[in-house]
């Protein structure tokens, strides 16, 4: 749910991609959203809200951008499973940050990513649970960091984002204009031969 300044509901988005990997067995509990990728118009701009696992799919970010999103927002709850090595933890965190910075660059839009912090035990007792890595961040339309939150504690921060800059970046790097859509039909196939 996205709320307007006066508390009214501006819109809603249902998570489209549901994970089923170690410590994240969400397919058992959730059904994928069925509303597609529609930005939400608000008094502060048009928001492309994508939830958690949706952040790994460039198609989702691109569809939001093509439909008029002025900023991408990713509310997230991601972390490390207890058996992950320190090297693996760093690789996962780097990949998570990089893919979303890539969405900003490829679409010429700022990205706001908010992530949970803290630890959640595994009620089954099969693992020691998940430690959420925090590290929320805001990047501009060229993927440049405007803010990075700490990994280990909650923070409430107002970050200034120059929304007009996206238009300039899109003129310098007209990725949306120069797409070869006449050759992208394979993107709607699960696999290609």
Model segments located where?
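Short beta-strand-to-coil "C-cap" segments at the C-terminal boundary of structured domains/repeats
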Residues: 141, 160-163, 187-190
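CN hydrolase (nitrilase-like) catalytic-core segments centered on the catalytic cysteine
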Residues: 46, 52-156
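Cysteine/selenocysteine-centered motifs that mediate thiol-based redox chemistry or coordinate metal-sulfur cofactors
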Residues: 36-70, 76, 166-193
């Amino acid at each position: 749910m996205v709320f307007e300044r006066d508390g009214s509901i501006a819109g809603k988005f249902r998570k489209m991609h549901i994970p089923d990997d170690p410590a994240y067995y969400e397919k058992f509990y959730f059904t994928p959203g069925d509303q597609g990728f529609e930005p939400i118009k608000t008094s502060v701009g048009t928001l492309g809200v994508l939830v958690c696992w949706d952040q790994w799919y460039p198609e989702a970010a691109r569809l939001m951008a093509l439909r008029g999103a002025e900023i991408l927002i990713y509310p997230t709850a991601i972390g490390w499973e207890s058996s992950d090595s320190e090297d693996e933890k760093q690789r996962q965190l780097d990949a998570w940050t990089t893919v979303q910075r890539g969405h900003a660059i490829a679409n010429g839009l700022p990205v706001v990513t908010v992530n949970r912090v803290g630890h959640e035990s595994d009620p089954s007792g099969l693992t020691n649970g998940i430690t959420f890595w925090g590290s929320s961040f805001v990047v501009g339309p060229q993927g440049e960091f405007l803010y990075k939150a700490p990994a280990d504690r909650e923070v409430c921060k107002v970050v200034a984002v120059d929304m007009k800059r996206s238009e300039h970046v899109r003129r310098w790097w007209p990725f949306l204009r120069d797409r070869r859509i006449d050759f992208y039909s394979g993107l709607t196939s699960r696999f290609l031969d």
